[in-house]
Amino acid sequence: MEQIPSFNELIEKSIIDHWHKDALTDFKGAVLQYHDVARKIAKLHIMFESSGVKRGDKVALCGRNSSAWACAFLATLTYGAVAVPILHEFTADQIHNIVNHSDAKLLFVGDVVATQIDTTKMPHLEGVIYIPDYSLVLSRTDKLTYAREHLNEMFGHKYPKYFRQEHISYYKEQSPDELALINYTSGTTGFSKGVMVPYRALWSNADFAEHVLGNKIKVGDNIISILPMAHMYGMSFEFLFEFIKGCHIFFLTRIPSPAIIAAAFAEVKPRVIISVPLIIEKIIKKKVFPKIQDPKMRLLMKMPGINRKVYEKICTQVTQAFGGNFYEIIIGGAAFNQEVEAFLHQIHFHYTVGYGATECAPIICYADYQEFVPGSCGKAALHMQVRIDSSDPQNVPGEILCKGPNVMLGYYKNEEATAASIDKEGWFHTGDLGTMDANGNVFIKGRSKNMLLGSNGQNIYPEEIEDLSLIHI
């Protein structure tokens, strides 16, 4: 494998190279160009430094996807602090648990989260910052209060004449193994594990995306960020890779209902679509299945010769439903509905199914849609090794193991769980059961660990459901 470059240097280079290109937009909102992002990062760096945030300190972020969230995250990484992205769907208690367990010094919150949390239950926090405008919800130090009140003044003092590309010089991680972020698999105490993601894993995932999509996506192409950036799938493939590439990323700041997603696809026309099965299934079942249930259409689909033309027409309509400009749709994060997958394969739709885990930030397996085998989740991704722990991997399911730079450092403050997941040879035990054919295609057959996966990609532990049911009995 090639020498691993600095990931923060890639962020820096993209900002400098694409200074006057469109970077981030809240759908139906204002556009931030790369130089606007750089200015916001610079101001947050001043606030961090002036308030006493040190390299390696933890900074948590909890809110819906937005340009302001993205800037705060980039500022955290490029300052040398450790980001702790938290799913905004988590309950207040879950957010409190993660903030406390991660030793977060600062917490960025969105509008809804700001009204739900109880700061008295996070006693070690020094401040809570409102994501939309970076105002202070709470300050427990005079340094932070002063830094926010005098932020514009300090920015003007540091850059008295102008703010340009030559001023961009970010913190560069000292080692590929340096901790970049901590991503929690669940919010519940006892089930929550903080995955320590190193910079090498961020680079390796971005390099994989460049290898398989680099010649399909160009500078200025549009991308829609639908999946939560607090989930590694959305973080790596709807945000970080595209930002490094110089794309224009649109954030759906509202609840992504099928109607809102369809409107966004039609307007933005994204070049690549990253999705969990739930989104694809909802759109197909709502927009496509009703049309093909018509008796005449069903008859045409069964007639040799004619059915091929019908499939082509349906495929065109389905493609248009997703904006009509994408190279492929990459589906992952949960099991795909077999009926929907069979239909998409039948009409030769450009889709593929990948496989990953938070612990691999996230990619483990992938295949381009032209090489994809239906029912599989692709082959070992670039930089990764995958094997099945079975005496007969082609026929007898065994646990899926993987190894490579994508694999986490371990679970934060949980050596026992780390030792149970990563063996002495460096193989990560996914907890998923699968088989592998002679060509290396992996087929998932179930779970070996006691964890379920919702169709939106969120981890669900049966014990959590049991605990909740006992509370409500």
What spans do the regions from the language model cover?
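Conserved AMP-binding/adenylate-forming core of the ANL superfamily
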Residues: 3, 20-52, 57-66, 70-74, ...
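Conserved pre-ATP/AMP-binding loop-to-beta segment of ANL
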Residues: 20, 148-184, 191, 216-222
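Conserved small/polar residues in nucleotide/adenosyl-binding loops
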Residues: 185, 471-473
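Structural core segment of the AMP-binding/adenylate-forming
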Residues: 10, 51, 78-157
